[in-house]
Swiss-Prot record:
One Pfam family, short name: YbeY
Underlying gene: ybeY
Keyword hit for Secreted: no
Disulfide cysteine pairs (residue numbers): none
Role according to the record: Single strand-specific metallo-endoribonuclease involved in late-stage 70S ribosome quality control and in maturation of the 3' terminus of the 16S rRNA.
Binding site for Zn(2+): H114, H118, H124
PANTHER family: ENDORIBONUCLEASE YBEY, CHLOROPLASTIC (PTHR46986:SF1)
Taxonomic lineage of the native organism: Bacteria, Pseudomonadati, Pseudomonadota, Gammaproteobacteria, Pasteurellales
GO cellular component: cytoplasm
Organism expressing this protein natively: Haemophilus influenzae (strain PittEE)
Cofactor section: Zn(2+)
Protein name, entry field: Endoribonuclease YbeY
NCBIfam families to which the protein is assigned, alphabetical: rRNA maturation RNase YbeY (TIGR00043)
């Protein structure tokens, strides 16, 4: 199996309780499972203001969100190992973990896994797509030693 090179950008003032770069690389690698060569992605941890602005600009939603995925769209004739960017909002992740009574690191892992799958082209707009993606997320999370992230919804 190949590896995932993560460009970690911390754009939040409070860094207490954030996952380490090693954890993020482990979670991203589990989700992406690169074959052969190294692939690259950016993970940017932001505050609510930046998440809100990006969510409004790119999705038309007037609120911050937990994770945004921006797949890299490379011309076919160019071969670059870039997957894209994840933007994860610290406050939203912390709030959701508390509301869902999940361990904070489990929710961070889930956001990296979820976003990583989006970079690979998975989606959850249609019910069948959502079922496939959630099943894969559950398998990956359990492989990392975490509980099913959708257990409370089942």
């Amino acid at each position: 199996m190949g590896s995932v090179l993560v460009d970690l950008q911390i754009a939040t003032e409070n860094i207490e309780g954030l996952p380490t770069e090693e954890q993020i690389v482990q979670w991203a690698t589990a989700a992406i499972q690169p074959e052969g060569n190294e692939v690259e992605m950016t993970v940017r941890i932001v505050d609510e203001a930046e998440s809100h602005e990006l969510n409004l600009t790119y999705r038309g939603k007037d609120r911050p969100t937990n994770v945004l995925s921006f797949p890299f769209e490379c011309p076919d004739e160019v071969e670059l190992p870039l997957l894209g960017d994840l933007v994860i909002c610290r406050q939203v992740v912390e709030r959701e973990a508390a509301e869902q009574e999940k361990p904070l690191m489990a929710h961070w892992a889930h956001m990296v896994v979820h976003g990583g799958l989006h970079l690979l082209g998975y989606d959850h707009i249609e019910d069948d797509e959502a079922e496939e993606m959630e099943s894969l997320e559950t398998q990956i999370m359990q492989g990392l030693g975490f509980d099913d992230p959708y257990l409370a919804e089942k």
